[in-house]
Regions:
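Surface-exposed, secretory/extracytoplasmic low-complexity segments enriched in Ser/Thr/Asn/Gly/Pro
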Residues: 1-198, 203, 250-252, 257-274
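Active-site scaffold segments
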Residues: 204-258
Length: 274
């Protein structure tokens, strides 16, 4: 009796070729110093064979990418931060960090596996950060101490500038939120519009929705405890020259770290030179 399928059957050969093709694929992901290698031994467990048809189980691909996302995404996570005051703190909140578009990445990864093409992949991201690993914000960032009403700008780990400021009015519930954010964009000569105000500013640097840093030429003093009763609607009000200087250094994506630190309160405020 002649077998239904012989070893030289074209259909069988095609099936074996497909299985071999999947089995030789090696895809490498680099997350800083960490390397994740996906090879044929894993991919072969994602294959479904029905008769001569070989299909890649998309759910298995999605599950794999989801484990990468869980391991390497840093958005919405707490961060350890060494302040300019020599104290290490934990900063919660904010929307800064690596954020993988895992569904899109799973589609593109599956498509690459289907072609049988080995190589290195960079995941598809909704949002990237400065660095893999800790700290993901890197060494260029704006540090905002809401307790001291004082900010610092570091570039490549070096302090470049600092300034007093006035943040959100505590008495009216406009406290500037803590958290790790990034500069959304920067704009010259913007008009800030709220429910009951319309304010033109020369240097606008938003980082948390409608909260940002800007010059406040209507103020003659900054720092101290002004914010407690005469603060802003949430923005970081800066002296004109300091806002101008910071504007020249920062760019879209520059991390902004806001925190409170007990023991750094300052009762005195800085007066602008007349």
């Amino acid at each position: 009796e002649t077998p239904a399928v012989t070893s030289d059957s074209e259909e069988l050969q095609n099936t074996l070729q497909k299985l071999q093709k999947y089995g030789t694929v090696t895809i490498t992901y680099r997350f800083g110093d960490n390397i994740e290698v996906l090879d044929g031994s894993t991919i072969s467990t994602w294959l479904e064979v029905d008769g001569f048809a070989v299909t890649l189980d998309q759910t298995q691909v999605e599950n794999y990418v989801a484990t990468l996302r869980k391991k390497y995404d840093s958005i919405f996570r707490s961060r350890t931060f060494m302040t300019s005051y020599g104290k290490e703190i934990t900063v919660d909140g904010g929307d800064y960090g690596w954020w993988m578009n895992y569904q899109q990445e799973a589609k593109e990864l599956a498509a690459q596996i289907e072609t049988g093409e080995s190589g290195e992949r960079t995941p598809v991201y909704y949002q990237t950060a400065a660095s893999y690993g800790a700290p993901d914000y890197g060494d260029t960032y704006v540090e905002i101490n809401l307790t001291a009403q004082h900010l610092f700008f570091y570039k490549d780990g070096q302090l470049v500038m600092e300034s007093d400021f006035v943040s959100g009015n505590s008495a009216r519930g406009y406290d500037t939120p803590e958290g790790t954010y990034s500069i959304t964009y920067k704009q010259r000569n913007a008009t800030l519009v709220g429910e009951n105000y319309e304010t033109p500013v020369s240097y606008w640097m938003p980082f948390n929705k409608n909260i940002g840093m800007h010059d406040a030429t209507w103020r003659s003093s900054f720092g101290g405890t002004i914010y407690k009763t005469k603060g802003s609607h949430g923005c970081i009000n800066m002296p004109y020259e300091k806002a101008q200087e910071l504007y020249g250094y920062i760019e879209k994506g520059t991390p902004v770290i806001c925190y409170h630190l007990a023991g750094t309160e300052r009762s005195t405020e800085s007066e602008l030179e007349k």
